[in-house]
Amino acid sequence: MPSSREIRNKIKSVKNTQKITRAMEMVAASKMRKAQDRMKKARPYGEKIRNVAAHMSNASVEYRHPFLISRDSVKRVGIIVVTSDKGLCGGLNTNVLRRALNEIRTWETEGNHVDACCIGNKGLGFMSRLGTQVISQVTGLGDAPNMERLIGAVKVVLDAYTEGQLDRVYIFYNRFINTMKQMPVMEQLLPLTDDRISSEDGEARPTRAPWDYIYEPEAKPVIDDIMVRYIEALVYQAVAENMASEQSARMVAMKAASDNAGNLIDELTLIYNKSRQAAITKELSEIVGGAAAV
């Protein structure tokens, strides 16, 4: 059994750790609320640009954007993996990376080549160790998604798709369900599917819209720009969801760590009291034995 001094030092060490985890829990709770607000504020823009993109995809008959055209054969797949830069958030990153790994193995088994765009340091490190080619990356976003920093990495993927270097693009991220639940999801970004180009209530739009916009000077550059902005909005929304999930998972993980530290302190205190009681009993027995001998 360890000595009383060793047990006291252990209790002190666990208490110090508990103070840190409690502080991190409170910080994560504050950041979580802000991340949820950012996520909700991003939705109106995403809905509006989706409506515009949906109308353009059906209204303009003179030009069909490449993002809307499905390719017959798929040989090269691009993935955008959204993770956090930091750890201490439970199994959040592990879950989404496991989902991505399963899909990568399936594609490679089918003979497809996979290129990755990594948003977040954890995903970048994982893809580098896995040996997957990383064509673009963004790390150090902090506590708020920055569209200006995301655009460069996303543009590399979009250009690769437009030039035929990628035949399909998917995005992996953690969808925020509630404070206690985050779900790793995979969604197809390119080519845009019917569920992406749909009305706000989820119903598919008619094959031919009854009216169209007036394009100045022509439709092609306007549609090109809108489609790119739409994909950027989808990626931004995914990053915002992942950040809200990250702070929620970190708050829950730090609360669990604080609770476990409290339980460990109780157990160590009990061991310390038993050890101290045994030492006192031993001393009393020695005193009584010595007095009886006299």
UniProtKB/Swiss-Prot annotation:
A GO cellular component term found in this entry reads:
plasma membrane
Q: Which UniProt keywords apply?
A: ATP synthesis, Cell inner membrane, Cell membrane, CF(1), Hydrogen ion transport, Ion transport, Membrane, Transport
- Topology in the lipid bilayer: Peripheral membrane protein
Q: Which GO terms describe its biological process?
A: proton motive force-driven plasma membrane ATP synthesis
Q: InterPro entries this protein is in?
A: ATP_synth_F1_ATPase_gsu, ATP_synth_F1_gsu, ATP_synth_F1_gsu_CS
Q: Which GO terms describe its molecular function?
A: ATP binding; proton-transporting ATP synthase activity, rotational mechanism
Where is the protein situated, by its record's location annotation?
A: Cell inner membrane
An example of a Pfam family matching this protein is ATP-synt
The principal localisation class reads membrane
Describe the function of this protein: Produces ATP from ADP in the presence of a proton gradient across the membrane. The gamma chain is believed to be important in regulating ATPase activity and the flow of protons through the CF(0) complex.
- Assembly description: F-type ATPases have 2 components, CF(1) - the catalytic core - and CF(0) - the membrane proton channel. CF(1) has five subunits: alpha(3), beta(3), gamma(1), delta(1), epsilon(1). CF(0) has three main subunits: a, b and c.
Q: Which family does it belong to?
A: Belongs to the ATPase gamma chain family.
> What protein does this entry describe?
ATP synthase gamma chain
The upper taxonomy is: Bacteria, Pseudomonadati, Pseudomonadota, Betaproteobacteria, Nitrosomonadales
